[in-house]
Amino acid sequence: MNKIRPIHLRRSWLFVGAATENHIDEANESSADVCIQEFEDFCVPERREFARKIMPEVIATWKKRGKVAAVRINPLEDPDGIKDLRAAISANVDTVLLPKANYPYQIDKLINCVTELEKEFGKEINSTEIVPNIEQAIGLENALSILEKKQRVVASLVASEDMSVSLKSPRNKTSKILNY
């Protein structure tokens, strides 16, 4: 693995729009431990190609500033997912975040793709971390199986608002559902 901040010391994770240059510039100056170039929710499809083009510079800058450089790709079921992943591995990203991680086979597919791309780009095998994003009730139900992919999966994020919607939880100012 790369010599990056250990997972248990990553206190702040900053998601920025993959093609939103002013937010990327602000991330450069932030104190975030992990900066994430976000392709799925924060980047409209028309801007993804541009975002992939600037990715090598974004990743290099974050690394130079001592940040864990991460990319949240589109799901691999989306045609842009593999394009995002290819760009991320070629840019020497530290960590790949996979949205909508609902089933172990999705992680298996991602691991296989990452390994093949590491070989293709001459990157050390198993050097790219994977962080599944569990956003739906079915992903929560399958979380243990998803997280057992130990050679690559270093952590998981739960998208609290998406999860709340998936669970059909009532949301209001006094709601405590996201406390658990």
Task: Say what each PLM segment does.
Residues M1-Y180:
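Expand to "…catalyze enediolate/carbanion chemistry for C-C bond making/breaking, isomerization
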